[in-house]
Amino acid sequence: MKLIVSVMPRSLEEAQALDATRYLDADIIEWRADYLPKEAILQVAPAIFEKFAGRELVFTLRTRSEGGEIDLSPEEYIHLIKEVAQLYQPDYIDFEYYSYKDVFEEMLDFPNLVLSYHNFQETPENMMEILSELTILNPKLVKVAVMAHTEQDVLDLMNYTRGFKTLNPEQEYVTISMGKVGKVSRITADVTGSSWSFASLDEVSAPGQISLASMKKIREILDEA
């Protein structure tokens, strides 16, 4: 599993002050641009992409409806994604499929989509349908993060992930059970068939995240012969 760490600057000054060397243990950097005012995102972008030049990077605009910090109309959402994609060619672009399904057709030319679904309230009963619909669209990655309230919620998502990965071995998945009870899902990625696990450096970007240092140690232990 690859370890992903998010950067969440709230201003150009914070972006410029980021110390990229602190993120060397991360395999991929996620830029959570939703922590900025929408009019500042394109102004801050050069600093982020220069700071992490040569690193794999995910561009993410996590909207409030899916647990993020920004509200965007479909037109604003698509415009910002397309501008960043065309100017900086991030390795991955997160797209909130269920929040912006009506404009998804405008993203069909982008081969590096992470089609995502986030539910900070529950693990919905229709998880299989969600995973199936996202898988059929054949994105670079399918990402699902849902809140776990019981151990069964966690086991269900792990089992669904393993099943879908077995049936679709070429498709990459990232599935996460959020919250304290869901922490175990963050360290079992290799078993369930999830490609990434999100870790934290200073500030968590989702409930239940484990520190990068701890995740690195856990991965080393799991990789031992």
UniProtKB/Swiss-Prot annotation:
Binding site for 3-dehydroquinate: 6, 30-32, 62, 186, 205, 209
The protein's name: 3-dehydroquinate dehydratase
Record pathway: Metabolic intermediate biosynthesis; chorismate biosynthesis; chorismate from D-erythrose 4-phosphate and phosphoenolpyruvate: step 3/7
Keywords for this protein: Amino-acid biosynthesis, Aromatic amino acid biosynthesis, Lyase, Schiff base
GO terms for biological process, alphabetical: 3,4-dihydroxybenzoate biosynthetic process; amino acid biosynthetic process; aromatic amino acid family biosynthetic process; chorismate biosynthetic process
Catalytic activity: 3-dehydroquinate = 3-dehydroshikimate + H2O
Stated family: Belongs to the type-I 3-dehydroquinase family.
Matching Gene3D superfamilies: Aldolase class I (3.20.20.70)
